[in-house]
Curated annotation (Swiss-Prot):
Key words of the record: Acetylation, Calcium, Metal-binding, Repeat
Name of this chain's protein: Oncomodulin
Organism: Mus musculus
N-acetylserine PTM sites in chain numbering: 2
Keyword Electron transport attributed: no
Lineage: Eukaryota, Metazoa, Chordata, Craniata, Vertebrata
């Protein structure tokens, strides 16, 4: 299974195009354009597993830095400020990592 089994390759490409320049990544815009915001809880858990590179069950800042590359390998890395903003947007319990439930809440907010 690949990420394009869940999301359209065209939607992913369009979402990445919108944030190709550093410091232009806006999570909610990315979620909408890529189609993530329309996904069910089950589909988002599948997406979360793709993003969770080390399969630890949560995303840390190191994994978030490569968030865009999980959708397309040649995409850019998130900047430090983008990574921090993404963490702040989802880390509801302040433990420095994002669980699957927190990810789902962020995408659907």
């Amino acid at each position: 299974m690949s990420i394009t089994d869940i999301l359209s390759a065209d939607d992913i490409a369009a979402a990445l195009q919108e944030c190709q320049d550093p410091d232009t990544f806006e999570p909610q815009k990315f979620f909408q354009t890529s189609g993530l915001s329309k996904m069910s809880a089950s589909q988002l858990k599948d997406i979360f597993q793709f993003i969770d590179n080390d399969q630890s069950g949560y995303l840390d800042e190191d994994e978030l830095k490569y968030f865009l590359q999980r959708f397309q390998s040649d995409a850019r890395e998130l900047t430090e400020s983008e990574t921090k903003s993404l963490m702040d947007a989802a880390d509801n319990d302040g433990d420095g990592k994002i669980g699957a439930d927190e990810f789902q809440e962020m995408v659907h907010s």
